[in-house]
Amino acid sequence: MPEGILDTSTVILLDRLADSSQLPSTPLITSVTLAELAVGPLVAEDQLVRARRQSHLLFVEQNFDPLPFDRDAARAFGVVSSSLRRSGRKIAARTYDAMIAAIALSKN
């Protein structure tokens, strides 16, 4: 599988994946995923969970160069969001996913 953008939930589970053969050969992440991961340690109430999340965030920061949410992605976000609204879905619940999708669309 060539390069591909990983969703935040996949990035969270990277160190626990038993079979990475289903991942792209060149995994990519977005700045949105990095932002989501940055929230994790800050909202963790348990110190062990906070430390584990912080360690994972540092690992991701050191091993990935995130694709930015730039002007092209912003335009694509309009397309994704309007499509969600037309289908009757609430965009607020899917904003991060829509932003990641917009970055992916803008890179094609």
PLM features per residue range, with description:
Residues M1-L58:
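Short, well-structured N-terminal submotif of metal-dependent ribonuclease cores
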Residues G40-A44, V60-F64, L84-S87:
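Alpha-helix C-capping/helix-to-loop hinge sites
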Residues Q22, F64-D65:
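A ubiquitous short alpha-helical element
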Residues D65-N108:
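Active-site neighborhoods of divalent-metal-dependent phosphate/nucleic-acid chemistry enzymes
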Residues S55-V60, F69-D72:
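Short hydrophobic interaction/assembly module
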